[in-house]
Amino acid sequence: MPDYDAIIIGAGMSGLYQLYRLREQGFRVRAFEAATDVGGTWYWNRYPGARFDSESYSYGYSFSKQLLEEWEWSEHFAGQPETLRYLNYVADKFDLHRDIQFRSRVTAAVYDEGSRSWTVTLENGSRFSTRFLITAIGPLSTPTLPRIEGREDFKGASFHTARWPKESVDFTGKRVAVIGTGATGVQTIQTIASQVGHLTVFQRTPNWCAPLHNGKIDAETQAKIKAGYPEMFARCKETFACFLHTPDPRGAFEVSDEEREAFYEKLYGERGFGIWQGNFRDILIDRKANATISDFVARKIRQRVKNSAVAEKLIPKNHGFGTRRLPLETFYYEVYNQDNVELVDIMETPIERITPEGIRTSDKDYEFDIIIYATGFDAITGSFDKIDFRGVGGARLKDKWRQGPETYLGIMVHEFPNMLMLMGPHTALGNIPRSIEYSVDWVTGLIKFAMERKLTRLEATPEGVKSWTDHVKALGEGLLSNEVNSWMTGINSNVEGKQTRIVARYSGSAPAYRARCDEVAAKGYDELRLG
């Protein structure tokens, strides 16, 4: 008999809930976590300004009425420290720590056909066997550093945003470089600009950003939030991407120019992702419609940035608004009006190397005390590539996915029996915690089904994998976001072999995804090979 009924890799948001649900069913379960405590993304990403881009109250767990009553978010978009406190509160409340082994990085997982079990190997060489293997390793958890010579030569301090130290970093009077202007770069830049002596931002690709409009939650609003939780979570189940916002049913050209401008102005002044997820229905599929919102936001950037040359560098020219995941900001553009902030366009003057004193571009040597790498993640498949997963006959998952992931429902892979993925490739993302809860509940239902019937082997069929993968690819056709180089299309210039676009995510609606998964469960999982 295996050591465990289920092993979970990871103790972030998905791992914690999966542990809770399986333990609730009475199964023998263990979670292995590389960090020293729970939190996942919110444990590692401690960089200045890290916070939600989903409303706090729509991001937290919905499974416990008592938890919803007890916990009070202080802001509409909570910062990393508060979010980490929340996840620790959850772990303490449901006594989850006792079944999590920390400082335990999983390096390999090998399936044995004879015993129909997985052997999981940790970095320290320890091994554990399990009937079911559940990956809760997150789509954005493997940081990448730029392929620039000389990184090790720098004599100052350097940090990646996703591996920020627990101790606070003193920026007072320091000469600081930030490489990267994605979501983490934007949050970091706008937060430290008022603290540093001088800030130099190295930008390769500008991103469209929109105001976050965060604020404190007062007692009256807190009471309304708590009273409205059932309605709010029901709404999240109905919306396209599980956010509070849903697309406007009108097309961008079904209204007058004046109405369209007023609508964009209204969205620009509202909290959160409304301008992205609550916009006209065609802005992400029709180039002309997209051009109207892109032009509107470009005009806003020009209004907010005083130096016209700098403003133009901050306006994307190679992709339309919303075709990449949208960073939300708080006075980000105004940062570039400060005398102590400089923007370097590395498409014009590329970085040649890191020097002991700082950064050398094609036209200048810069000296710094601190370099911050806001260079993102090897997204979606990167966390799987870091672990040596081997299925039937020693098949390597990394080899199987070399030309792009192939999955069944984004949860299972042919030749990898009893391996179940949470938030893996080809699954619904959006407001991730809402998708996490559904995926965990579905996986729990499948394991319960198997255990009750003494089934020891569950495997996706080649036909099922092909059908789902083809379906996911078809859904992506016509979406402007799939014509753009970004982490959502598998592009990462800092990772060898990831310079070709792939279909890495499910582009359909979350309700449609759940309906398909529910259909499979309702039919007794007969699309799987059960044994």
Language model features with spans:
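Active-site-proximal cofactor/substrate-binding loop regions of enzyme domains
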Residues: T191
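Flexible, glycine/small-residue-enriched loop-and-beta-strand segment within the central core
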Residues: R163
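The substrate-binding groove and active-site-proximal loops of carbohydrate-active enzymes
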Residues: K174-I179
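N-terminal FAD-binding dinucleotide-binding subdomain shared by FAD-dependent oxidases/monooxygenases
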Residues: M1-A6, A11-E152, E167-S168, T181, ...
